């Protein structure tokens, strides 16, 4: 099993490399704005909050690459999935030299306002990766930060395996399957391999999920609480939505306190101390650098003292709208929307996904019936309901936050599918439990071959998605033209034969992984 796990990580890493290489520069969500903040931290030692904050180097590259926004916030790709920049007939882009030959001053000559002003942790780490390629051209530095994001994603894949070990206990193949589904989920890989803080948010949230499950399994330990505190501080220093994680941790703590009431006093004091800290951070310490990361403007600026504007009926209306919006728009985004939200996957992909998810839900219904019929209260059942409750709480808190935002601004913030990725391991694990329930009933001794089939389908979905996206950017009519176009506006070490070599290794490791998954499943079947 250890060899299989190592093979999974190698395969997942090369898959992430392929996404990094084939996705053109500035084609991840707001990548140029996130990179501008990384560049400011690396070059200026601070985040610009007043005046221009984006370098001439980035601005010029945006104009050349078609991602420069107009007055409405749109670029040439927005609403136009057919658009592409003009390509040359070799591995060097038509205007690649203009970007590569810019003077050093172009990195600090700020010409427009576009950089993000997000909490600092990801950008601090990104600045380290940036400096590792400091003397390189723009493409070198972007890919250095992308590689850092991909390595963090490998940490998320590892955590998915560790979480699988807890919730599936002795069923090791289930843990490997969960990690495989996470490693090759295409939209997750996409958002985890660009210059954006999602990958760190997802990793830290997954770590919180893992520690919460450890509390359910082993009880409350001081070392676990220290790690949780550290993860929460790091998470809030990455994304402010990370505050939601405190609700999830609290559930695990509540469970242990219910079993051991002696912890009640310490828990209540901790909750009061945390609430007081949030209040002070949002009132008296709001202008201090570290404490601004804990700011909750939707509560303290618009809704906290305006209870007359909050209506239960209006919230229910907003909740119903959110559920419909989630099904019609957010759900497809969860599985894949690319190219500045202009490119979706072929409809048949979503149709297959929806039917498979319905099969998984059927398995969950059967599982719930069996749990209540047998009155099961074992650890696996506790883990199942914890993951289910965590997912529902996350959705509800996000909906309440969006409702408060709506009160203050008159419109919804606009929830995207990737906003739910912090709990993607929980979502996939829940569905996997449903499938496993069905496999045990209908496949009996061959149930583990069903698990391999799921992993195989996700890998195929990943490859088809990447091919579909790459085909929207590059001419795939011949391998020579495809490699030439994919090489343009990339670092020197990510051109021509390097691309072909990486793609070949990726397919090879995927085939090896599938082979050994099948071999392992057959061995356990016998």
List each model region and its residues.
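Membrane-lumen/periplasm interface segments of multi-pass, membrane-embedded glycan/lipid transferases
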Residues: 286-371, 486-503
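Transmembrane-helix motifs of polytopic, lipid-linked glycan transferases
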Residues: 144-168, 207
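Perimembrane helix-loop-helix junctions
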Residues: 211-217, 245-276, 369
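Transmembrane-helix signature of polytopic, membrane-embedded enzymes
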Residues: 6, 139, 160-184, 446-449
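Interfacial juxtamembrane loops and adjacent helix segments
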Residues: 45-145, 302-306, 336, 341-343
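Membrane-interface transmembrane helices that cradle and orient dolichyl/undecaprenyl
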Residues: 168, 208-224
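Membrane-interface alpha helices of multi-pass inner-membrane proteins
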Residues: 224-240, 245
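Transmembrane helical bundles and short interhelical boundary loops of multi-pass, membrane-embedded
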Residues: 277-278, 305-307, 313, 445-526
């Amino acid at each position: 099993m250890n060899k299989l796990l190592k093979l999974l990580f190698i395969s997942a890493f090369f898959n992430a490399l392929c996404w990094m290489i084939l996705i053109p520069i500035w084609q991840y969500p707001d990548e140029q704005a996130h990179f501008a903040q990384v560049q400011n931290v690396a070059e200026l030692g601070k985040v610009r909050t007043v005046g221009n904050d984006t370098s001439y180097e980035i601005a010029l590259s945006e104009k050349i690459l078609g991602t420069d926004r107009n007055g409405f916030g749109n670029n040439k790709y927005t609403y136009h999935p057919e658009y592409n920049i003009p390509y040359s007939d070799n591995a060097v882009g038509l205007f690649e030299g203009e970007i590569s030959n810019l003077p050093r001053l172009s990195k600090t000559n700020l010409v427009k306002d576009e950089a993000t002003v997000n909490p600092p942790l990801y950008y601090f780490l990104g600045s380290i990766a940036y400096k590792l390629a400091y003397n390189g051209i723009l493409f070198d530095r972007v890919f250095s930060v992308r590689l850092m994001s991909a390595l963090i994603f490998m940490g998320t894949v590892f955590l998915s395996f560790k979480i699988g070990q807890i919730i599936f206990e002795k069923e090791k193949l289930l843990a490997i399957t969960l990690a495989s589904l996470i490693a090759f989920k295409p939209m997750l890989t996409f958002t985890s391999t660009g210059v954006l803080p999602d990958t760190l948010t997802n990793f830290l949230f997954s770590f919180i999920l893992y520690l919460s499950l450890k509390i359910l399994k082993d009880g409350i330990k001081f070392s676990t609480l220290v790690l949780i505190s550290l993860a929460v501080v790091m998470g809030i220093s990455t994304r402010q939505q990370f505050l939601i994680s405190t609700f999830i941790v609290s559930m695990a703590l509540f469970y242990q306190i219910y079993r051991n009431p002696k912890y009640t006093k310490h828990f209540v004091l901790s909750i009061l101390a945390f609430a007081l800290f949030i209040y002070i951070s949002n009132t008296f310490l709001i202008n201090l650098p570290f404490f601004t990361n804990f700011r909750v403007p939707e509560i303290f600026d618009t809704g906290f003292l305006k209870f007359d504007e909050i209506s239960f009926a209006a919230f229910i209306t907003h909740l119903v709208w959110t559920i419909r919006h989630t099904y019609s728009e957010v759900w497809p985004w969860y599985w894949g929307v690319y190219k500045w939200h202009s490119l979706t996957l072929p409809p048949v992909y979503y149709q297959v996904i929806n039917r498979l998810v319905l099969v998984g839900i059927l398995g969950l219904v059967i599982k719930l019936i069996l749990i209540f019929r047998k009155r099961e209260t074992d650890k696996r059942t506790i883990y199942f309901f914890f993951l289910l409750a965590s997912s529902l709480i996350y959705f509800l808190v996000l909906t309440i936050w969006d409702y408060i935002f709506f009160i203050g601004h008159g419109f919804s913030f606009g929830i995207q599918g990737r906003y739910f990725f912090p709990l993607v391991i929980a979502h996939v694990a829940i569905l996997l439990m449903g499938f496993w329930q069905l496999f045990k009933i209908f496949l009996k001794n061959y149930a583990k071959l069903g698990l391999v089939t799921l992993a195989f389908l996700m890998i195929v979905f990943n490859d088809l998605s990447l091919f579909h996206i790459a085909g929207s950017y590059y001419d795939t009519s011949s391998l020579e033209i495809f490699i030439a176009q994919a090489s343009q506006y990339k670092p020197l070490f990510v051109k021509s034969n390097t691309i072909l070599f990486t793609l070949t290794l990726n397919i090879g490791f995927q085939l090896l992984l599938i082979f050994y998954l099948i071999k392992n499943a057959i061995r356990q079947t016998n």
